[in-house]
Swiss-Prot record:
One Gene Ontology term, aspect cellular component: host cell membrane
Major localization class: host cell
Membrane topology reported for the UniProt record: Single-pass membrane protein
Protein name: Protein ORF1
Presence of the UniProt keyword Transcription in the record: no
Annotated spans, Disordered: 1-20
Keyword terms of this UniProt record: Host membrane, Membrane, Transmembrane, Transmembrane helix
Residue ranges with Low complexity bias: 1-10
TM helices/strands, residue ranges: 51-71
Organism the protein comes from: Snake adenovirus serotype 1 (SnAdV-1)
Compartment list: Host membrane
Amino acid sequence: MEGTDWSGWGDDSDFPWPKGSRVTFPSYQLEDPPYAAPSDLDLVGKGHLHIAFVILIVSLFVLLLGVLLACHFLRRSLSPISVSSRCSPCRLFYDRCRPYTSLEKGVELSCV
């Protein structure tokens, strides 16, 4: 920074101790005591981990709900011509594919 007047900053008249003296601290004060509070970085990391876990659980729930709704609507919208395609989407989640007897066609599967 050119043009800045630094006179009066940091001269020895600001400090009451003699010139050349040093302040020393005992070694135990330089370390964190065992009862010290966790640092802010530790708390932020745990908070982010908790938020990520909640987002994961909610997204898995939404995914499961989407699969169940898709199965529900696919089950209703598929044509009754093909028996195997009618029951394949809902067989995994629903136990609604049950046999019924017909005099003309014999035993078939029906998704109700």
